[in-house]
Amino acid sequence: MAPPPNTYSESWWGGKEERGTPVVVKMDNPYSLVEIDGPGMAAPSEKARGKNAKQLTWVLLLRAHRAVGCVAWLAAGFWAVLGAVNRRVRRSRDADAEPDAEASGRGRAMLRFLRGFLLLSLAMLAFETVAHLKGWHFPRSAAGLPEKYLRRLPEHLQHLPEHLRRHLPEHLRMPEKEEIEGWLHRAYVAWLAFRIDYIAWAIQKLSGFCIALFMVQSVDRLVLCLGCFWIKLRGIKPVADTSISNDDIEATAGDGGGYFPMVLIQMPMCNEKEVYETSISHVCQIDWPRERMLVQVLDDSDDETCQMLIKAEVTKWSQRGVNIIYRHRLNRTGYKAGNLKSAMSCDYVRDYEFVAIFDADFQPNPDFLKLTVPHFKGNPELGLVQARWSFVNKDENLLTRLQNINLCFHFEVEQQVNGVYLSFFGFNGTAGVWRIKALEDSGGWMERTTVEDMDIAVRAHLNGWKFIFLNDVKVLCELPESYQAYRKQQHRWHSGPMQLFRLCLPAVFKSKISTWKKANLVMLFFLLRKLILPFYSFTLFCVILPLTMFVPEAELPIWVICYVPVIMSVLNILPAPKSFPFVIPYLLFENTMSVTKFNAMVSGLFQLGSSYEWVVTKKAGRTSSESDILALAEAADADARPPPAKLHRGVSEGGLKEWAKLHKEQEDATAAAAAAAAPGTPVKKSKAAKAPNRIFKKELALAFLLLTAATRSLLSAQGLHFYFLLFQGVTFLAVGLDLIGEQVS
């Protein structure tokens, strides 16, 4: 029998009920429908009306306050942008004092071309606007004329081929002689005839060629994505040999047995004061027998303060028992390749079997060598094991987010697919382990290009060495946070391959590798992905598309402008699914970067001076959250050892004294120079400041060109073309004003 209901608990709303006892509330009439103006509807009182009116007033006031706040926020943001633009325009001359390909004579040709193109487009826009206002685009009584008359072509256009006649606008009708009014109208008619006879077909032919290249490159990208999908589906990945032989036990008897070959770690750096300490700290904490590992810090810095700091950091870790040495070249030639070549010439290098390379901003995990070196065991043809990059500042700003999309696709798709199916890919220059014999058989590091990593990879591939890419082994590093640093990095990355292509092409045909590998190296690795991609991207979207707005007889299909690029951008963003909201900004930004990549490709192909320039990418010195864990492990390890010499901020006591002395000398020299220049003026201590934001003239010229073309598209009522040109022009404008990356106030 059920217990009687607890009326007390029901009336008290569960306040005094027993813990865990549910409260059941029964409603006699759960669905009570009251008819409006019916007998059950009570008349609203004046008090309720006043209350509702007050509530409505407060809601409206709250929404009005939010609207005003939104408008004020937009106005403040717009004013801040205008202020930043004004400051950058005023500082542009000072910023241009830094060496740059754009400011030199060899870089002015493209800027002059873009300026001339812009001036011509503005003149054509003014001309077309006058013609549109006067109705010269249409017959005077177009509404009352039959359709067949509107489609009629003049006699001198009957000879046009069918594919050009098909692209002629339906409203085009050349006026008769008696309809021409004045010299301006006559000039416009002559311009119409000239662009149809001589310009339209040339633009149409060039656009067809670029569309064909675009489709070939799209198919290549689709095949790479399918290959990556198949690798994920089947779980294909390199497997290391973890077995332990008797030779391994004898060679590492003091380390408990295992496969621990002699490994040399090289850390090339140059004036990278922001990141040297973190990088050296991570490398020195790699889990490997210390007597079987040597760390070379290859310092090419010309800043004496930076040299002293790096030397002091090396001294600190040497006192802690790490086998580490500091090297500084007196003859600093050949950039990074010359630095590595000089380090490999040391006599003690012959005692080592493998060499791992880390740039100054890389932070390897302690198990890096244990995850990479075992792949060499039992695989004598393996020359390189490459790890994937991971980025500590990928969410810092919009620029780093877009870079993360690009590089995630590069590692997840390009490197992994080429490594699995071809056993060849371009060495990324860092976070990789080389077999020293492979380097020596391939001629070692060469200084002939600025992409020494790709150079050694191609030569090793021609000698028959195989590569492995480990997608699950990641090494933290930094992305450039400013557009200026990213632009210089991309210029070097795209000019060097074209320079290398010219140099190694004879060696490719003379090599003994298979014909298929030769074709892949020439057609896909160099031509399609290094030359064709920047060529068609710049030509199609930055030159031909604006031209078709002023020459409407030649047009680009909508699927070329919109649909296929969006699909390709979605494929690019799949390895980084969290970045999917940035698919449209990524597409627009990649088109913007085509200017820099095209310019770099041309300079490398024709061996212009800018292809030999090497600029060290600026670093911010950011670290990961894993640094805290490593610091705790370091502290625990330090407790088990006798206390070393007193350290301060990661430098030894002797190194700190030397640095302090040098720093004081520099301060005294600065104070003396300031006093001599302006006697009686107090001297302010200056901090190391970042380079200010600047304006980029090529991007600005293209921004105004695309916006002019967008305005012209309104006269032809081309809606989708207008929106694409508008957004692309605004993107060029934001990049040209350096509003996309790090903002230095």
Curated annotation (Swiss-Prot):
List the EC numbers from the record. 2.4.1.-
Q: Membrane-crossing residues?
A: 116-136, 196-216, 531-551, 556-576, 695-715, 720-740
Q: Which domain of life is it from?
A: Eukaryota
Membrane topology classification: Multi-pass membrane protein
Major place of localization? Answer: Golgi
* Keyword Flavoprotein set for record: no
- Quick one: a GO cellular component term? Golgi apparatus
Q: Which GO terms describe its biological process?
A: cell wall organization
| A GO term for molecular function | glycosyltransferase activity
- Identify the Gene3D superfamilies for this entry: Spore Coat Polysaccharide Biosynthesis Protein SpsA, Chain A
Name recorded for this polypeptide:
Probable xyloglucan glycosyltransferase 3
Which gene underlies this protein?
CSLC3
